[in-house]
UniProtKB/Swiss-Prot annotation:
Pfam families in the record: CitG
InterPro entries in alphabetical order: CitG (IPR002736), TriPribosyl-deP-CoA_syn_CitG (IPR017551)
Name of this protein: 2-(5''-triphosphoribosyl)-3'-dephosphocoenzyme-A synthase
Keyword set includes Transferase: yes
Keywords for this protein: ATP-binding, Nucleotide-binding, Transferase
Catalyzed reactions per annotation: 3'-dephospho-CoA + ATP = 2'-(5''-triphospho-alpha-D-ribosyl)-3'-dephospho-CoA + adenine
GO terms for biological process, alphabetical: prosthetic group biosynthetic process
Enzyme class: transferase
Length: 292
């Protein structure tokens, strides 16, 4: 399909550098979905609480999205002189086109819609920082992404009308701001919790997969995951958070033997039809930011 125009302004960024970050985004998506076992989520073992998607759908989806990540970076660079609040409007057509390719790759299954939003924001932030010759670090990337989203929660979640979206309904009922709120705040769950936790475990010599699984548990324990709340209401969300917190308090995932706890947690999530997709999206960002 034809790609939407990004900007008439040229960028000084090397194609190889753009492709390097896009490749990291693709690897982040694959790393997350291949990670196993994950409670309630699609992985190499089963489809979790999802009856409409499989591992191969995520592989096809990630490949389709990878082709669009350079466009997010390029737009971030080309719009570097724009006010940050104006950038999101220009990113939307790219995101919608990327989403269309995702749905075509998966025959209509929503595998990575949340990641298109979050990775698209981070890639645009990276492009802006590179164009302005500013350091690209997890902190600068997240703060730049936050500047793109200033006022987003007010605009999109606090609107009162008779046709509430799922996000608006969960915000009004439970105060959950979901992906929008986390982005507008600069991804504090990732920057202040998941990323340092993951890096500390790696520094301690823990196997990278076990470290990621333990980090996923941490995110599940602290994230007000709208994916979980939309399936199980407030009760389902609180149950999942408590279970994750209990496993962490028992020592978390430190050895292969601890995977039995995750397998049991997975069975219980499937029985309750709960899938922590929002936490999975944040895990993708955690791995991505750990590489830069």
């Amino acid at each position: 399909m034809s790609m939407p125009a990004t900007s008439t302004k040229t960028t000084k960024l090397a194609t190889s550098l753009i492709d390097e970050y896009a490749l990291l985004g693709w690897r982040a998506m694959l790393t997350e979905v291949n990670l196993s076992p994950k409670p309630g989520l699609v992985d190499r073992i089963n489809c979790g609480a999802h009856k409409d998607m499989a591992l191969e759908d995520f592989h096809r989806s990630a490949l389709a999205i990878q082709g669009w990540l350079p466009r997010f970076i390029e737009f971030g660079a080309c719009s570097a002189e724009m006010a940050p609040e104006a950038v999101l409007h220009g990113l939307r057509p790219i995101g919608m086109a990327c989403e269309g390719d995702m749905f075509r790759a998966t025959a209509g299954v929503n595998t990575h819609k949340g990641s298109i939003f979050s990775l698209g924001l981070l890639c645009a932030a990276i492009g802006r920082l590179l164009q302005l010759n500013q350091p690209v670090t997890p902190t600068t990337v997240c703060s730049t992404a936050a500047s793109f989203c200033r006022g987003l929660t007010d605009r999109e979640l606090r609107t009162n009308n008779s046709q509430l979206t799922a996000g608006q309904r969960l915000y009004q009922q439970l105060g959950l701001t979901g992906a929008r709120g986390e982005a507008e705040a600069g991804y504090p769950l990732v920057l202040n919790h998941a990323l340092p936790h993951y890096l500390t475990l790696l520094d301690q010599g823990l196997d990278p997969e076990l470290a990621l699984l333990d980090t996923l548990l941490l995110l599940m324990a602290i994230n007000g995951d709208t994916n979980v709340a939309s399936r199980g209401g407030e009760g389902g969300l609180r149950w999942l958070q408590r279970e994750a917190q209990t496993l962490l308090q028992k020592g978390g995932i430190r050895t292969p033997a601890d995977l039995d706890y995750l397998r049991q947690f997975d069975r219980e999530c499937i029985e309750r039809n709960l899938s922590p997709g929002g936490s999975a999206d944040l895990l993708i960002l955690t791995w991505f930011l750990a590489q830069i």
